[in-house]
Amino acid sequence: MAFAQVIMLLCSVVALSTACCTPDQWEGEEATIGGYAGRRRAGLLKEFIAVAYDGTNNRTAAFVDYQNGEHSNKFKIVTRYENGHGKLYVVDLKKGKCWTKSLERPFRKACIPDDAKKIGSYYLGLKDGFKVTGYDIRGRSINAFVSVETLDDNQCVPVTEAVYGKLRKVDFVQTVGFINVVAGIRNETVFDIPKECEKREEFSLAEELSREHYILAI
């Protein structure tokens, strides 16, 4: 079972109460690398992602450069919530094909759960350089370690994220690094429903790219 198929089954560990949240709107880039191992298959998954997060209007967008072993592809993933109903759009940019899926879960706010254990603050690189705060987050299916830059008592910016766990006899670990994070949205058209998805059809995804196992990553 591919790692990308496994992760869509994982339960989110994000709680309703939070220690801190990202700004309501931001953009940035994420670089991820992960490994998975099951009875029949093991592999390495790598992604480079341009992301946009809009917590004000309950929507996200991600342009994913994806590699799983020798297989590589490019996807656009848009999540939108309107009138309390969520929809996931995944476009295979090489094939020009769209998959859609209705979402029963609520919009996932990019927040550190209130029950996360604060590990402490430390510096990346030189002492007195870039200061971050680390959190240990324990869930039923996955665990995570997240480091953030604190902006104020309520807001933080993601720096690194590592998630790991086991499901259906498949072990996995994934790390995420955040770069070039800026507040605000420069071009809101990134959240538009992709033109490839204008037909109201729903398909079973051959390659699930759910992001719900993350804490702050998109």
Question: Across the structure, where does each feature detected by a protein language model lie?
Answer:
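Secreted/processed peptides and extracellular or luminal domains of membrane proteins
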Residues: 17-18, 25-28, 59, 94, ...
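Short, solvent-exposed coil/turn segments at beta-strand boundaries
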Residues: 25, 50-61, 77-87, 127-130, ...
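An acidic-aromatic
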Residues: 47-115, 164-172
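Acidic, glycine-rich loop-and-strand cores that form catalytic or ligand-binding grooves
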Residues: 105-134
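Short, intrinsically disordered, charge-biased short linear motifs at domain edges
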Residues: 5-11, 98-100, 180-186
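N-terminal leader/targeting segments and the immediate start of mature chains
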Residues: 2-59, 69-70, 121-126, 190-218
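Sequence contexts marking disulfide-bonded cysteines in secreted/extracellular proteins
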Residues: 19-22, 97-101, 110-112, 155-159, ...
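Gly/Pro-enriched, hydrophobic low-complexity segments
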Residues: 128-200
